[in-house]
């Protein structure tokens, strides 16, 4: 059986990333795919990117990565990430724009005879030229909604991120939200392992404990703009919309 590791939305959480990557290698994953969003929210985006490169992870473009490439360091409507925060993170990533610009929006793999698309989220038809390349995030996805959203996709399954919350939905295709590696309230770094041979594929979710206290300290020591707020909103979920 061959194996592919899939992670998503690391968002500068080096503490989570540095435990999940060696675990995926230990489990025999010959390829690891990150489905977008290295940048913003967490305190160590640059260090995360360097570690992803060390492990030869295939990085796909997320909306925050795209913001960095296009230097869109302003607060956006409906976003909880401030201009000050984005400016700080983008400054920490200085010199890496060209590498981030090389991230593809999606890749496909044939696993067990099935075509799988990996991406950050469902793309607009004109995603390469659109003002915003991804369709609006659906907070309450269903098979019917995803079937409509992904109707033009020629594939059997889609693995994606963006919402940070894992889900597994079977409609006309298989829809799998990988969930964020560590952008949640649990002190666990999470990932998916896809196993396949010539005729079949399946997948399992894995979780590895990581040092959440270390992350929390880096986000609240006063260095990261809005770090305490972002910790409460994106990780602890003690602040709601």
Go through each PLM region and give its residues.
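Acidic, His/Gly-rich catalytic cores of divalent-metal-dependent hydrolytic chemistry
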Residues: 168-241
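N-terminal active-site segment of His-dependent metallophosphoesterases
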Residues: 1-55, 226-227
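Anionic-ligand binding region
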Residues: 130-169, 173-175
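Active-site neighborhood of divalent metal-dependent phosphoester bond hydrolases
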Residues: 55-109, 114, 136-152
């Amino acid at each position: 059986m061959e194996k592919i590791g899939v992670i998503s939305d690391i968002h500068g959480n080096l503490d989570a990333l540095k435990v999940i990557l060696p675990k995926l290698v230990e489990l025999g994953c010959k390829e690891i795919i990150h489905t977008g969003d290295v940048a913003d929210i967490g305190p160590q985006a640059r260090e995360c990117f360097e570690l992803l490169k060390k492990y030869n992870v295939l990085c796909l473009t997320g909306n925050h990565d795209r913001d960095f490439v296009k230097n869109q360091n302003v607060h956006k409507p409906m976003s909880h990430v401030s201009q000050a925060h984005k400016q700080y993170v983008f400054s920490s990533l200085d010199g890496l724009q060209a590498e981030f610009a090389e991230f593809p929006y999606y890749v496909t793999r044939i696993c067990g005879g099935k075509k799988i698309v990996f991406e950050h989220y469902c793309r607009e038809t004109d995603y390469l030229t659109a003002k915003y390349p991804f369709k609006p995030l659906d907070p309450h996805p269903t098979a019917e909604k995803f079937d409509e959203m992904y109707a033009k996709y020629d594939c059997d399954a889609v693995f994606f991120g963006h919402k940070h919350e894992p889900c597994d939905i079977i409609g006309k295709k298989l829809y799998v939200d990988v969930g964020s590696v560590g952008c949640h309230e649990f002190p666990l770094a999470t990932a998916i392992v896809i196993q396949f041979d010539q005729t079949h594929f399946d997948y399992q979710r894995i979780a590895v404990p990581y040092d959440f206290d270390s992350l929390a300290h880096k986000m609240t020591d006063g260095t990261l703009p809005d770090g305490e707020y972002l910790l409460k909103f994106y990780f602890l979920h003690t602040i709601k919309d």
